Amino acid sequence: MSPKPSENGIDGDDERDEEEEDSEEEEAEEEEEDEPRLKYQRMGASVPSLLSADAATCIAVAERMIALGTHGGAVHILDFLGNQVKEFAAHTAAVNDLCFDTDGEYVGSCSDDGSVVINSLFTDERMKFEYHRPMKAIALDPDYARTSSRRFVTGGLAGQLYLNVKKWLGYRDQVLHSGEGPIHAVKWRTSLVAWANDTGVKVYDASNDQRITFIERPRGIPRPELLLPHIVWQDDSLLVIGWGTSVKIALIRTTQSKGANGTYKHMSMSSLNQVDIVASFQTSYFISGIAPFGDSLVILAYIPGEEDGEKDFSSTIPSRQGNAQRPEVRVVTWNNDELATDALPVHGFEHYKAKDYSLAHAPFSGSSYAGGQWAAGDEPLYYIVSPKDVVIAKPRDAEDHINWLLQHGWHEKALEAVEANQGQSELLDEVGSRYLDHLIVERKYAEAASLCPKLLRGSASAWERWVFHFAHLRQLPVLVPYIPTENPRLRDTAYEVALVALATNPSFHKDLLSTVKSWPPRIYSTTPVFSAIEPQINTSSMTDPLKEALAELYVIDGQHDKAFALYADLMKPDLFDFIEKHNLHDAVREKVLQLMMIDCKRAVLLLIQQRDLIPPSEVVSQLIAARDKCDYRYFLHLYLHSLFEVNLHAGKDYHDMQVELYADYDPKMLLTFLRSSQHYTLEKAYEICVKKDLLKEQVFILGRMGNAKQALAVIINRLGDIEEAIEFVSMQQDDELWEELIQQSFHKPEMVGVLLEHTVGNLDPLYIVNMLPNDLEIPRLRDRLVKIVTDYRTETSLRHGCNDILKADCVNLLVKYYKEAKRGVCLSDEVDDVSSRRGEKSVSHLGERTMSLKSVEVKSKTRGGGRCCICFDPFSILNVSIIAFFCCHAYHTTCLMESSISVGGKKEAGVAAQRTTSYDEYPNGVNDDYEDEDEEEEEEEDATSGALPMRCILCTTAAG
């Protein structure tokens, strides 16, 4: 495995031998490198100066401080940074073991001088106990500061384990065990005390003064004084033992006994404790220290050389050969699966043996461990002690994990780790920047661009920096789709640079179009983009997407006419809506062909509506000029046909062309066109119809040309339609043509029969019958003759009926005219209401004639040339009412009234006076039955107004 990165001067290295075989080195390089589980830091502050003149032997860790023992017999109290807080000159020989109580108020130490010293950290209290033999291990009661018994256990080379308890009369030692060799280690947890001697590990319950179990010393390992055993409580029930090359984990279980009443009764631990070995494995290295690491283990490993053996361990003096391996920190599972291995280059490691190293840990908040990670501040600390070094190891946190991933090029995993741990924005920025730099170096520009929204987030400055960086690398087009337009909004220059980069690269013209459509126009200026695009117009790099993008920019800039020209070239389907929206009818003039090709129907409608702006000559010339680009003749036909329907004469110059166009595209409409138009050449039209074999059209043209006989021959010989021939001859009103028709029909008896059926109203059937040859056989002749006679009678009857109706209409109209003519018109300066109403009704019935008569009378009155037909006095101009009749007689109103009364002195006159308006009889002998209803209406009107009936005296007398 490759060397681990250095942290604060400590390098991790997995090399075991600098002279390994080449094959092993290659295999190690091929293995995937595992991430370290721990990070290391050499303890500084006061420690280097302390160890420069002395050597460390052991260490103990409390919740708030550290105790370091030395060969000189001193106990140094340090904070976690290595600063010395206190110093106890406790012993005269090397300190072998240290121990804090749970509260961290007392520290106990034992030494080769045979003494045990317990010092209070916060008071001057100090107790010293002499045992006169080197003491190797000590453990304070976890509740030492809380109880008055002040218990501790200690042992050494004497082979006796002492329990020291404070009594009424002072401190008293109780020997818990003896006779099985020196006591090498002791640990106290709750009420359980575990110690190791030459035979193995034993556990004692201090609460009941009873030994619980014995765990035998592993076989095949050097003597305990050469390879010390290491024991540590992982929790209240798990005891971890590392001895030589063996690891065992013992579980001390508490069981419950069922009482007489069926309930569970809690009994004392000593009576029910059971010990199970839950894990056990062998190692390939010597164990110099062991500690729990969550649900795994941390082992301080000493790697033996080939010459290492029991003989070498017999000396406690450091080796002078200088060939020892570096100590290693290994993280393993309970099944000895290796999770991490780190070699520590401590000072002077070449000369140290396994017993020169020790390991202590501080698992104060181990309950926060979950999923391989500890909460911030709760991670355990591990202290590796060598004679001249103290190295702190602690679990790597999320930031360390991220840095390790970055150093190994796993930027994506680093980013995922940052996001999963909701890292600080500064860390995310750093990871993002390094990730992007890595991708840029690898030339993975597209991937880098896709990650920018996630990595740069809302930082406008970061976005702008990367925009210009991509631009410098000529890779800005791949970043454009991800550039934000809001939150954050960048400077206009950034967007303009992006658009220019897209515009100058034909491969990204489609992206330019989509970008222009999606970006708000307010965030950039179009001028730089115009400057980048316009030089490409009419060049090979002017692609359709670039044209459309330029058109969109013209729209944004308000240059709709330029945009229309580009849209027309691009044949955009919504071009017609664009024209209407921006009123661009003037611009249509130059783009007739494009409009026709987009949608010929809408184009024709537009051109017809705007024919004043775009004359037909312009349209026709553009379409003819495009003969190589499209079916221009079809477009011409559509346009000229619509133009002809709107205005028969608007396209008269092209009617000759239209004849041919109709013949090609719409022959059914040609005949209608020929009948409606007067602006085409008959000869040319006839040639086209002959060429296209359009028979009816030939007949029509021949008829207009005066070749009626030739037209008739076409009908009979080509069409074979005798009815059409009869209709044609009837329209020509030429007797000779009838004879021609009859003569040509004789050759076809069936035509003669049809001719006989259609002669009524046109020819005398007898004339045709007389001309028929005697031997001519006519199919269904009898039936046809019967039909001829029947049709003739029907025609005669219809004519008589029509004559009768005509006569009746004449009589009715004459009577109506006479009745209107009998009415008078009052001419006066002041006309009463009744006369006005009656005059208005008369005017409405008489129309223009009444008004003209009134004009004549007014002029006569003005001139004064008229005379009353009764008194023969001339009419005065003022203050005299005059009654004028359509018979050209006029009277003074007073004269006419007096004459009417005198003439009507008889009874009939009285009756006539009571009626409003009536006529006794008409001069022509027609009675009043024709207009009874009209007269009744007239009488009702006169009766309502109270006026007397007015009649021309002269005409009435003459009629009588």
From Swiss-Prot:
GO CC, any one term: HOPS complex
Ranges of compositional bias, category Acidic residues: 10-35, 928-943
Protein species of origin: Solanum lycopersicum (Tomato)
Gene3D superfamilies registered for this protein in UniProt: Tetratricopeptide repeat domain (1.25.40.10), YVTN repeat-like/Quinoprotein amine dehydrogenase (2.130.10.10)
Biological process per Gene Ontology, one example term: macroautophagy
Family statement: Belongs to the VPS41 family.
Region (Disordered) location: 1-39, 917-948
Lineage: Eukaryota, Viridiplantae, Streptophyta, Embryophyta, Tracheophyta
Keywords, in A-Z order: Protein transport, Repeat, Transport, WD repeat
Protein's name in the database: Vacuolar protein sorting-associated protein 41 homolog
WD repeats: 90-132, 178-214
